[in-house]
Amino acid sequence: SALTVGALALSGCGATNSGNGESGGSDVGSDNVNTKWADCTPGHGSKDTTSMKADGKKDITIGAFNGWDESFATAGIMKNVLEKDGYKVTIKGFDAGPGYAGLVAGDIVLLTDGWLPVTHADYVKRYGDKMENLGCWYDNAKLTIAVNKDSKARTIGDLKTMGDEYDNTLYGIEAGAGLTKATKDSAIPKYGLKNLNFKISSTPAMLAQLKKSTSAGQDIANRSQRGQGLN
């Protein structure tokens, strides 16, 4: 099964990684994060809001994750819909950890881009009792290792013997991301990639390196998430 991408709101709102051949991993699990937050069908539970009572608070802030195009795109859709209903909406960018912290602190009222059950599992375990799950809007996202299209590697396993082609480096995102943990604990040992320097930074930093390397005609391997604009 694939991981889901959904929306989380401020409320009074361990999975394991299993490989799918050498093309990437899907996310499955039986713990609370998976069953409560990630097991859903896009659009399920949607309701007509035209008859609902208007909220008294009209100035709201929606959070989006820096470097995640789909995060800003879905936040923009929500902004457009809410402003038609008379709200004044601001979209504010965060890295994932500060974004979840800002949600539970009340600095923002909505995140549209929770990746579960792996990538954001630690944040949901930490803050879940203070958030509300508003459902998911995508259910076929994948955690992957990506390379530039014109490079030689065609499977994750190829990187075991082709590390020199990629400066023996695998670029990652935030240290606290479930994707980072899955890379260290699952992907690297499974595919024998201990010869690669797993460089942990942030999503914006990884994207900057991706742009720098490809612009210079250099091959690059990076941890990625299929379903995001960065792919």
Regions found by a protein language model. Give the residues of each.
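Short, well-ordered beta-strand elements
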Residues: 31, 37-40, 55-70, 87-92, ...
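Extracytoplasmic small-molecule ligand-binding "clamshell" domains
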Residues: 60-63, 68-113
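Pocket-flanking alpha-helical
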Residues: 75, 95-129, 205-213, 229-231
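Ligand-binding cleft/hinge of the Venus flytrap
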Residues: 78-85, 163-196
